[in-house]
Design a protein with these regions (language model features):
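Juxtamembrane/disordered regions of integral membrane proteins
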Residues: 1-139
Length: 139
């Protein structure tokens, strides 16, 4: 039986892809997101954003993909569909419902939560598919 190993190249590419999906998602949701978040306008946000936010985003994506890849080696995930199902299960249990509950207690609009968490759903699905399909084995 072949032993699965972590695919570092897939993790690096996913971390970059996630930044691109984030930009596209918030580009589409821009004005509505700004309104729901109670901010002034997109231009003000772009000029005020610290480079630390981008560094944190890339680090978060890389760490998430590494941990998901590690979990996949333990669960013997061998297909994109298996990867998607596990990633979405983790997302629902550990991310979405926690974020939604917190936002509701902070009196934030549900639509804001759906916009913010919609991109996480897409990224978890993407990571599950890529890491499930693009497998590496120990020699």
């Amino acid at each position: 039986m072949k032993t699965l190993k972590i695919n570092i190249l897939a993790i690096a590419l996913l971390a970059i892809m996630m930044q691109l999906t984030n930009m596209a998602w918030y580009g589409l949701a821009g004005d509505r997101w700004v309104e729901l978040a109670g901010l002034k306008n997109v231009a003000d946000i772009a000029s005020a954003t610290s480079p630390l936010a981008y560094i944190a985003s890339i680090a978060n994506a890389g760490l998430f993909c590494f941990m998901l890849a590690w979990i996949f080696t333990k669960l013997r995930v061998e297909t994109a569909l298996q990867g998607i199902l596990i990633a979405i299960s983790f997302y629902g249990c550990f991310v979405f419902f926690g974020a939604m509950t917190q936002d509701l207690f902070h009196l934030r609009p549900l639509m804001l939560t759906l916009i913010n968490e919609g991109i996480n759903f897409i990224n978890y699905t993407l990571a599950g598919a890529v890491l499930g399909a693009w497998r590496k084995y120990e020699a």
